Amino acid sequence: MLHFANSIITLYYMEFLNTFSPEKIVALEELNSKLLNKNPSPNNNIIFVYCPPKVGSTTLVSSIRLSAARKFTVIHIHDETLFSAISNNENMNKISVDDIILYNKSLGKNVYVIDIFRSPIERKISEFFEQVSALHFNNSEKNINLYNIDKVICRFNNLFPFLSNSDYFKERYGLSNIPETFNFEKKYLLCENNGVKYIKLRLKDAHLWGNILTEILGTPITIVNDYETDKKPLADLFNNFKNTYKVPDNFLESVKNCSSLAYYYNDVEREEYLNSWESKKIDIFNSYTHEEYVFYMKLCLENQSQNIIQVEHYIDIGCLCVACSTKRSKLLSKALRGEKITEKIIHSGAVNEIKHIIDNKNRIMQARVNRINELIQQRNARLNRPPASGTRLVKNNMKNIVIK
């Protein structure tokens, strides 16, 4: 049976080799190594959370890492921009996310790809606020937090039609076996193509993701909320926006005609959602034309002075060193008890915590040794004996504790 499985893997790999040039295969190997560099002990299970931004994916990534970091390697990616950020060749070989997914499958890995659907208006709002500082206003979050809310709403409405509403599951995965209707009983879709398992979730079911993923992945998954905009420096402005915003009538009509909303929400869910915005509807708004939007984006990108790519914004970045694993166990225990997770597992911080614990233990031990030596010296003095030789504390070697 094992021989048969190895033969299948070999066939996958040979077929993959025949698909690309030798130069591209080398580039794939290099890029894949960089993508997995957070995991010093690669396992045979890899999950690509490959979806649009602002759909709840950061929560999903951190939850899987926190629950099963040693069983699953998790790669979070929205598009090929990440490849250029971590590769010296700026993706000159035109490697796509699909290439990396199929490459890992050709290596014999169990590969999962996850996408998430989020209700359209909320997704557009979150996407806008994700780049409101670095792109749209090119100002610090602290200063933007003081902006007049009408100014921010006007900018958002001008951009509304152009803010993404893409569906990776249908548009990017190349699946030909997508069901005609969403599985409203199971609350997810699971399709397989080229040996890769593709999963579609809904953000509205986030409270059920733990059970859903436990069933699909075959290991317990606990969901922890991560990277919520209303807890960022822009929290005041964001919450004010959510409480103030009323959707223009022409925008709401476009949402009513949204095919993704009609597919991922059943009739009752869709009606409830639309009614929630119908009560907050205003007159039509004339947004930017396509030409105006193109000019706007060109100008914003030329003026941009901040880096949009974010680092270490997850609760768990997936490092498997002893220090990070120890911190992970503590946070997972909190999550299982239903406690809110407010800390992050960042390697340098986890290492410092371990060092702090060891230093405290060393200080306590040294104090005890000093006290024992003091008592011995007092006893020897009473008995007129020569002083005992001091005891030296051998400090712990941190190389045995963490991977630096």
PLM feature segments, named:
Residues M1-Y13:
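N-terminal amphipathic/basic-hydrophobic helices that include classical n-h-c signal peptides
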Residues Y12-K404:
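Membrane-interface amphipathic segments in extracytoplasmic regions
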